[in-house]
Amino acid sequence: RMYQLKLDANDPLKGVLKIAADGDVSASGANTKGTDIINPDNICVTQNYVYIQEDGDSFWPEATHNSLIWQYNIATGSKKVFMDMTHGDANMLNSIYNPAGANQLKKGIWEHGAMEDISDVIGVPGTFTINVHAHTWIDGDKFLNPSKATSVQSYKSGGQTLIITNVPR
């Protein structure tokens, strides 16, 4: 779920908290688990939209789609898919990016994260970066604990940083 907190303009100690995006039930009350928004993780807020990035690597067993970025319209409260994490080439996907194991066919195993508006930095309106967490892109030990951070267990997964343009703000 993603919540929206609207503060009272006259008294910031008062406000209304509501569910803005719910992946468990639709507005009509129907069960939508795995078909709508899954495990919202990161958000990027612009003047008119909230971009909600799913954390699909939670291996949601009911997932029916790969990780998505949803565009939530602040004015209307509606949301739609903005970007899909479709991997493309099935042969490459299963030989390089998902070399073995039970997770290779699961939906949402890669995710988007860290969406940032860089328009003001580079002087090009509507330009954003997005990080792709490619959790099954293993490639031997090439990506073994790349940050060298102390971790409960070592990990290895590749990633990419994308620059996208013409993003509505």
Task: Describe each region flagged by the PLM.
Residues 1-169:
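Sequence/structural signature of beta-propeller domains
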